[in-house]
């Protein structure tokens, strides 16, 4: 992997997130936009990636074939769908390319494929690339260790109407951070839905509630509720650029790393706190 001018390829270049990833790649010093990809048959194929993102002409045209651009990038940034990301993962593993994965909604087999690939290539895989969200995850660990055994814990998340997975990857990461701090497995204590006569709340569980409406970029709250008081830790995103900037920053951070599985907390060095 090159030590300077890390060349990135953007998957789903014509989507909302893809366009902002292009903008972020063009703006960050030390990063070069090397390739932009769209699905076969897209009307955007052949377009200039910079013009597509409203950033001016770059000379990088949108293509559908990874083979055609395999010599043009060092790190592949993917915020698409699980099935597409896994295809891209296999290609990157075969050709020794780093990856930044922001796709959510993987099943356990998909997550295992990412872990397996990290034996051969360097991957940053995170549910959320926002600096604020990752600071929040660290705060949740601290709060859970102090309050978790004595409070009812609920996670509430809201996103735009087009989001296809629920709960969000970030909400699940919040649950995992809390469960880990309490020496629990989230699979054993998560409650994802309540309907009808549910009975009283089961102590020690972590509840999840999901909202899908309008154009909400992303809102997440963790509630630690006791009798007479509750602590709420909330993050609200108002622009996808916060995720795009974090993803491109992660690609730059991968410079010089040959293999391994990392997350945004590694990029921000939060694990040392």
Swiss-Prot record:
<dbReference type="Pfam" id="PF05173">
    <property type="entry name" value="DapB_C"/>
</dbReference>
<dbReference type="InterPro" id="IPR023940">
    <property type="entry name" value="DHDPR_bac"/>
</dbReference>
<dbReference type="GO" id="GO:0016726">
    <property type="term" value="F:oxidoreductase activity, acting on CH or CH2 groups, NAD or NADP as acceptor"/>
</dbReference>
<dbReference type="GO" id="GO:0050661">
    <property type="term" value="F:NADP binding"/>
</dbReference>
<dbReference type="InterPro" id="IPR022664">
    <property type="entry name" value="DapB_N_CS"/>
</dbReference>
<dbReference type="InterPro" id="IPR036291">
    <property type="entry name" value="NAD(P)-bd_dom_sf"/>
</dbReference>
<comment type="similarity">
    <text>Belongs to the DapB family.</text>
</comment>
<keyword id="KW-0457">Lysine biosynthesis</keyword>
<dbReference type="Pfam" id="PF01113">
    <property type="entry name" value="DapB_N"/>
</dbReference>
<feature type="active site" description="Proton donor/acceptor">
    <location>
        <position position="159"/>
    </location>
</feature>
<feature type="binding site">
    <location>
        <begin position="169"/>
        <end position="170"/>
    </location>
    <ligand>
        <name>(S)-2,3,4,5-tetrahydrodipicolinate</name>
    </ligand>
</feature>
<feature type="binding site">
    <location>
        <begin position="12"/>
        <end position="17"/>
    </location>
    <ligand>
        <name>NAD(+)</name>
    </ligand>
</feature>
<keyword id="KW-0220">Diaminopimelate biosynthesis</keyword>
<feature type="active site" description="Proton donor">
    <location>
        <position position="163"/>
    </location>
</feature>
<keyword id="KW-0521">NADP</keyword>
<feature type="binding site">
    <location>
        <begin position="126"/>
        <end position="129"/>
    </location>
    <ligand>
        <name>NAD(+)</name>
    </ligand>
</feature>
<dbReference type="InterPro" id="IPR000846">
    <property type="entry name" value="DapB_N"/>
</dbReference>
<comment type="pathway">
    <text>Amino-acid biosynthesis; L-lysine biosynthesis via DAP pathway; (S)-tetrahydrodipicolinate from L-aspartate: step 4/4.</text>
</comment>
<comment type="function">
    <text>Catalyzes the conversion of 4-hydroxy-tetrahydrodipicolinate (HTPA) to tetrahydrodipicolinate.</text>
</comment>
<protein>
    <recommendedName>
        <fullName>4-hydroxy-tetrahydrodipicolinate reductase</fullName>
        <ecNumber>1.17.1.8</ecNumber>
    </recommendedName>
</protein>
<dbReference type="GO" id="GO:0008839">
    <property type="term" value="F:4-hydroxy-tetrahydrodipicolinate reductase"/>
</dbReference>
<feature type="binding site">
    <location>
        <position position="38"/>
    </location>
    <ligand>
        <name>NAD(+)</name>
    </ligand>
</feature>
<dbReference type="InterPro" id="IPR022663">
    <property type="entry name" value="DapB_C"/>
</dbReference>
<feature type="binding site">
    <location>
        <position position="39"/>
    </location>
    <ligand>
        <name>NADP(+)</name>
    </ligand>
</feature>
<keyword id="KW-0028">Amino-acid biosynthesis</keyword>
<feature type="binding site">
    <location>
        <begin position="102"/>
        <end position="104"/>
    </location>
    <ligand>
        <name>NAD(+)</name>
    </ligand>
</feature>
<dbReference type="GO" id="GO:0009089">
    <property type="term" value="P:lysine biosynthetic process via diaminopimelate"/>
</dbReference>
<keyword id="KW-0963">Cytoplasm</keyword>
<dbReference type="GO" id="GO:0019877">
    <property type="term" value="P:diaminopimelate biosynthetic process"/>
</dbReference>
<dbReference type="GO" id="GO:0005829">
    <property type="term" value="C:cytosol"/>
</dbReference>
<keyword id="KW-0560">Oxidoreductase</keyword>
<dbReference type="GO" id="GO:0051287">
    <property type="term" value="F:NAD binding"/>
</dbReference>
<keyword id="KW-0520">NAD</keyword>
<feature type="binding site">
    <location>
        <position position="160"/>
    </location>
    <ligand>
        <name>(S)-2,3,4,5-tetrahydrodipicolinate</name>
    </ligand>
</feature>
<comment type="subunit">
    <text>Homotetramer.</text>
</comment>
């Amino acid at each position: 992997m090159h030590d300077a001018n890390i060349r990135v390829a953007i998957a789903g270049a014509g989507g909302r997130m893809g366009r902002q990833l292009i903008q972020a790649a063009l703006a960050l010093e030390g990063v070069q936009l090397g390739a932009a990809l769209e699905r076969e048959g897209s009307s955007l194929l052949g377009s200039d990636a910079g013009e597509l993102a409203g950033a001016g002409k770059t000379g990088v045209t949108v293509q559908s074939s990874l083979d055609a651009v395999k010599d043009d990038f060092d790190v592949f940034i993917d915020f698409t769908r699980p099935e597409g990301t896994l295809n891209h993962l296999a290609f990157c593993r075969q050709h020794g390319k780093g990856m930044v994965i922001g796709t959510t909604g993987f099943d356990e087999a998909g997550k295992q494929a990412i872990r397996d690939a990290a034996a051969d290539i360097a991957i940053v895989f995170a549910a959320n690339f926002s600096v604020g969200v990752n600071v929040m995850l660290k705060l949740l660990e601290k709060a859970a260790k102090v309050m978790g055994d004595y409070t009812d814990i609920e996670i509430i998340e809201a996103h735009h109407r087009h989001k296809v997975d629920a709960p969000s990857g970030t909400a699940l990461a919040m649950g995992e951070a809390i469960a880990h701090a309490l020496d629990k497995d989230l699979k054993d204590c998560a409650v994802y839905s309540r309907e009808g006569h549910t009975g009283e709340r089961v102590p020690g569980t972590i509840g999840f509630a999901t909202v899908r409406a309008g154009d909400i970029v992303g809102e997440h709250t963790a509630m630690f509720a006791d009798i007479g008081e509750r602590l709420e830790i909330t993050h609200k995103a108002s622009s996808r650029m916060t995720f795009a900037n974090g993803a491109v920053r992660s690609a730059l951070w991968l410079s010089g790393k040959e293999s391994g599985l990392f997350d945004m907390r590694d990029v921000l060095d939060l694990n040392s706190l």
